[in-house]
Amino acid sequence: LLKLMQEYPYAEISVKQIIMETSLARKTFYLNFRSKDDVLESILNELIREYTEALSKENVDPLTVIFSFCDKNKAFLSLLHKNKMLYLLLLRLNEFLPEYSKTEDMSSNPFAKLMGELEPDYLIAFNVGAIWNVLFKWIDRGMVDSLDSIQETLKKYLKRISA
């Protein structure tokens, strides 16, 4: 699917093209997926799983994880952007992060420190939206700006507002 998305708009890609590109039998495809949307959903779920694993490591900086994730997945993010589908990743993050925050130790998370005892669901949505818009701006600019400099700018800003 991703290879096809490099050549064709997502809306124009058919299941038949996916089957031909992957040399899968039609029956095998339909045993695993109902549609091309299911294929894309599977890819998104795998990315979120990888992101979760990276966040779950001890003493990680969530901003570093976010920017490393984006750097590693530049090509995929670019394909989603080209097809006006970046919102799908945002939806997945909005589903995942509130649940994740309830099950993981958030004591080293700078966002958790800002939240304190406040209602987390709205604050998580606020933070995801803020980070998302920064990433969207980076993608929209062609991913030419250094992620390290963007991350450093955000860290300085967080330090200012938490002082």
Predicted regions, residues:
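Secondary-structure edge/capping motif, primarily at the C-terminal ends of alpha-helices
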Residues: 54-55, 74-80, 108-111, 138-142
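Amphipathic alpha-helical packing segments from all-alpha helical-bundle domains
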Residues: 86-133
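An amphipathic alpha-helix adjacent to DNA-recognition modules
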Residues: 2, 6, 11-23, 30-60, ...
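Generic detection of well-ordered alpha-helical segments
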Residues: 41, 45, 49, 64, ...
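C-terminal peripheral helix-coil segments that are non-catalytic and often amphipathic
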Residues: 128, 137-163
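Amphipathic alpha-helical interface segments
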Residues: 4, 73, 130-137
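Helical hydrophobic small-molecule/effector-binding pocket
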Residues: 58-106
